[in-house]
Structures are given as C-alpha cells and as structure tokens.
Amino acid sequence: MNNPSETSKPSMESGDGNTGTQTNGLDFQKQPVPVGGPISTAQAQAFLGHLHQVQLAGTSLQAAAQSLNVQSKSNEESGDSQQPSQPSQQPSVQAAIPQTQLMLAGGQITGLTLTPAQQQLLLQQAQAQLLAAAVQHSASQQHSAAGATISASAATPMTQIPLSQPIQIAQHLQQLQQQNLNLQQFVLVHPTTNLQPAQFIISQTPQGQQGLLQAQNLLTQLPQQSQANLLQSQPSITLASQPATPTRTIAATPIQPLPQSQSTPKRIDTPSLEEPSDLEELEQFAKTFKQRRIKLGFTQGDVGLAMGKLYGNDFSQTTISRFEALNLSFKNMCKLKPLLEKWLNDAENLSSDSTLSSPSALNSPGQGIEGVNRRRKKRTSIETNIRVALEKSFLENQKPTSEEITMIADQLNMEKEVIRVWFCNRRQKEKRINPPSSGGTSSSPIKAIFPSPTSLVATTPSLVTSSAATTLTVNPVLPLTSPAVTSLSVTGTTETTSNNTATVISTAPPASSAVTSPSLSPSPSASASISEASSASETSTTQTTSTPLSSPLGTSQVMVTASGLQTAAAAALQGAAQLPANASLAAMAAAAGLNPGLMASSQFAAGGALLSLNPGTLGGALSPALMSNSTLATIQALASSGSLPITSLDASGNLVFANAGGTPNIVTAPLFLNPQNLSLLTSNPVSLVSAAAASAGASGPVASLHATSTSAESIQNSLLTVASASGATSTTTTASKAQ
C-alpha cells in the first residue's frame, strides 16, 4: 500500500475515489483508527440515508443533504472498494483516516455501567460518526484544514472490544430508545485545542428524560437550524475553544435544554421580559404599587386606561384590582409587573415635574399622562349657610325648574349642577324620612280614575255657587276590593284644618260576602248621588256608587229617608241655589242635574223621596271605568265635621264610624265588619244608624237600602253615605270642600 500521506493527496485533488483514504490534511498526530466489520453497499447506503441531514457547526456550514447527494455515486464506489479490503482489516483502516484520534474519557463518568451489547452499540455509533465526518470532509474541501477529534465516553477502552458486527444504526438506535439509554454526545474539535475531555462530557438526565426524540426526528431537525440556533438550543454544551479555532459539534442525542435545577449555563436567547424570581417580590411590588397609586390619586380604572393608551395593552379595572390583590396567575402577574412598573415610574416623574413647574400642570389637558388618567373628583362640600338657604328653598319648592335652579345657583354663587344634584338628593332623603303613608302597590288605584286635582262636574257647581272653583284631591290608595285595605282618606281643599278627614270603613273581601237573599237579582248598575249640604261646615260631599238593587223596587232605584233633611238642606241652600222653602232631597237632586222620579210622599216618611237614576246620568261626568261593574260588596261611610255618637250605633254592631272630627276618637282605627253580619237584604228595613229610629221607615216594604234619622242635629254635623253590597266592588268615594 502507499503511504497514507501520499494517498491522501491525489484523493483530495480529485475529489472522488475511496472515501476511506481521505484525511483531514494535517501532518501531526497521525494515528491509525481501527474500524471493524464488513460494510456492504446496502448498509452503507442505508447509513448514509440516516445521516445525510447531519449538519456540522463550524466556520462555514453547508447542508449535508447536498453534499451527500453529490457524493452518492462515490459512496457506492466506496462501499464496493471497501469490501475487498475488509479481510485485511488493519491496513484498510489505517489508510482510511490516519490523522484522527479517538480519545476515550471512560474515567470521567462515575457510576456509568454499560453492558457489552451497549458498549458494542456505542462504539458502532462512533464508527458512524467517523464515517460521516469523512464523507462530509470529502465533499467540503475547504474544510480540509480543520482537524477533528472525537471524544466519547465509554466504560472500557476501545481496543478491548472486538469490532466484528456490521453497522446497523437505525435498528440499534431504536433498541437504545426502547431501553431509555442516554448516549453521550460527540464533539469534533480541532486537535490543537488543549481541552480536557471532561469539558465535553455531558451529564445526562435520568432515564425518564422527558421529550426523548427519535433519531429520525433529530436528523430532520438539524439541517433546519442555523449555526446560532444550534448553539443556542444546546445549553448543555459549552465550547471553551479559542476564538481563532474553528469548532464543529455533532449531537447524537436529542437536543434539549436541561432543567433549571442543574448547574448549566443559561440560554443565550434569554427572554427580554424580566421575570421576578419568586412570589414574595410580586407581593411586595403589588403592595407598593397600590400605595403609590393611591398617593398619586389615580383609580384602578385610570391605570388600566392609561396603559392601553400609552403602551398598547388595555387592561380593565378588574385586572388591576386582581393584580393588587394577588388574584392573578403567576405568569400573568409576571407579564403585568413590568408594564405597571413603567407606568408608575412615568406617573411619578410627571407628577414631580408638574409639581416643580406648576401645581395644576398635571390637570392640564396638554399633559400626556393626564389625557388618559382622570383625577378622582373631590367630594363637594357645601357650607352651612348655603345648606340652610337650600333647605329653605326646598321647603318652598321641592322640585324647582331649571330656571329656578339657575336663579338659586346665582344667588348662592354655586354651580348649577351642584344645586341640581343637591335637590335630587334632598328629595330622596325626604322620601326616606317621610315615606308615603298609603301603599301604592295597587294595580288599579283610585288615582287612575280621579286624577288629582280635578273638579266635580254636574253636581257640586250647581249646589254651591261660590266664586272659587271646587277642586278634589284624591290620594292614591288601594282599591276597595283589596283585602289589605285599612283606610281610605279623602281630603278636600278647605280653609280649616284636617279635622274633617273622612275615614272609610269597608268590609272584608267581597268574595266571602254572605248575602243569601233569594230575591236579589242582578240589575244594571245604578248611580246613586246623595248630595247633602251642612250649614255648620259648608261642606259638600258627593258619593257615587255602582250598586244593583232588588227587583221589586224596580231597576236603578234607591230610597232615602231623612226626617230632618228637608229643613236642614233647605236652610243651607236657600240663599245659594234659590230653592223653595219646601225643597226636598228630590228637588236638590233635580237642581244637581239629576232626573229623579218622585213618588207620593205619603208612602214614605216625612222628607222621603224615591230617586230613579239613569246610569248614564253621571256616566258622562265620571270615568267609564267607574260604571263598568254592576256589583258592590263594600259598605262605605264618609264622616266629616262631627260624627254620630257610639251609642247611636245599631245593637248588632253592623256599622262603626271612626276618626270623627267633632267628638273624641272613641274608635281610633277603621273597624272591619264581619261579612256574615251584613244581612242588608234579609231584614226589612235595615237600620244602619239607630235601631230605635228604624220604625219610622217601616212602611217601605221593598226598600233595598233604608237610612233613617230622627233629629236634624245629627244630619247637620255629619254626612252619611251608605251603599248596599252584593258581590265584587267598584266603588269610588270623592269629597270636596266648598270655600
């Protein structure tokens, strides 16, 4: 055979021929490397197919796939020429790579035990690396000046292991992966680099290393990485060679960064985001941030809005609140901390600069921070004298108009908005202090039927000829059919005090009324208007009810008997309405615009009259909703300016007046009558005022409602209105005071 140095020269010049006879072009450290096992063409081709994507890191990198494609024909020739030379194993290997040395650092790894089969596989992999280096070297002649030294880790010297098995890289790698055997990495270094082998030995993770890539995946990933990425993705490999020394690295094991717990160099591409080391630092920053933010006068919403405008990351108030309360995840808090820190520094710097220049500079619209950070508005404080003036204005008018608010603001030298807000708050306070006495939960209050204020039509103006208009004020109350009815207060507009407050005493819900008269038959609704005038208090009361009457009396008829009513009413209305001296109740009804049908007075008590009223008479003046129902189940009593004494009540206690103005309040609360005691239509007649006076109206055989009174004094000082009951109710009581 020729000299190895002489053989390598024509091989490098031609670029083809036996790849096993190529050298690295160096004249020192010429040592033969034993290579064992015959290599067939198919095996060499399969081996090169697995390693054609290996990329070497050095001064100039080229794709191994291109170089292997260029040398595919020479590889086949190499395989053919190696077969006859393998029987003489030592001379052929000596001619293959005479200038490379294999350094085994077996003593550097403690506790590593390899079975003979694993040692054989390890050495076969070293053979594969040598062959790949030779193929790459023959394809890249410009790299011929760079030497390669392979340092591998093994438990026994290489010379003690026979190299008789053929190279089957793919199968052995799969076996090693199944056994979770972590092979050591191989590093090709310039031989002039005086490095200890221990520097290139990588301490592998335990056998359960996560994410162990297969060899095929590794070989396809390596060519896609650049030199910088290859170096950055291998934090476990530290190349301490001199700057002038070109270096190559070949990684045979999966390239993965080691856990942070191992003492390895940090990644070259460390994140630019500064991550806090532990949670304590985050807690301290969150606490400090909250204190400084409050000191600067910014809200959490201001901070989130400012970060969105200044840094492009818009955060809600909830996010800032959770950060301060440490309710975010550690990762999100780490992301948020630098932004909040930057905003806080900017806000403090701007605040300090503004304080030095002018105290109000931070609030100017020209400032960058204030444009997106609104200062918290200070609480408005009103002086005592201004508050007293506002209270006085509130007592005069609780709901002033916009012009009045402007006038008050000008007088007090205050802002109009402040005055408006004060009045609004004061009205709410008034509602809390003095809530409305009557419950407004009714679905159909009387206020919907009679708006307040409204004037009585067709009855009162014809009876009272005063110059002032008679008005009616109705407070919203529960409907009379509601079981929660306690009292119905109807107050008129009078010059006197509220002693004339009327109280309505109503029965329980009409659904339980025990009216069992078989002779009671439904009839069209009747509107009974009883107009009485009292000279003592100059009070006019109008009671409108919708009631069915018994059939023997006729349709829409009611009989009212009052012995002393004639003289009392005539005396009160003689000067005003110009009525004759013998004016009766029928005459007053006719004067009011009604159309009564008079019967012979001999059939009734003195002053009695039979009023035949058409439902349409008052229907035009009142709301149609009032006349829609044809049944009435509530007894109402309206008393003002005095009442009947408690001794004049019926013995059975069917009716009780309460809250009278002229006499002491014997009964202080409305008294509900038991529906079972309301036998209005079973007895003839029914005395609602005095049982002793009931005999006066006994001649009325078929009266459905009979009211009697023996003295004029009781009628003068009281206004009595009674309606019969027979089912559901639709009753409205209105009262007005004449001026």
Curated annotation (Swiss-Prot):
The keyword DNA-binding applies. Residues 81-95, 353-364, 489-552 have a biased composition (Low complexity). Residues 1-11 have a biased composition (Polar residues). Residues 1-39, 67-95, 253-277, 353-378, 489-553 are annotated as: Disordered. The lineage of its organism: Eukaryota, Metazoa, Chordata, Craniata, Vertebrata. Transcription factor that binds to the octamer motif (5'-ATTTGCAT-3') and activates the promoters of the genes for some small nuclear RNAs (snRNA) and of genes such as those for histone H2B and immunoglobulins. Modulates transcription transactivation by NR3C1, AR and PGR. GO terms for biological process: regulation of transcription by RNA polymerase II. CDD domains: homeodomain. Disulfide bonds: none annotated. Residues 375-434 bind DNA. GO terms for molecular function: DNA-binding transcription factor activity, RNA polymerase II-specific; RNA polymerase II cis-regulatory region sequence-specific DNA binding; transcription coactivator binding. PANTHER family: POU DOMAIN, POU DOMAIN, CLASS 2, TRANSCRIPTION FACTOR 1. Interacts with NR3C1, AR and PGR. Belongs to the POU transcription factor family. Class-2 subfamily. GO terms for cellular component: nucleus. Keywords: Activator, DNA-binding, Homeobox, Nucleus, Transcription, Transcription regulation. This is POU domain, class 2, transcription factor 1. It is found in: Nucleus. Residues 274-348 form the POU-specific domain. The gene is POU2F1.
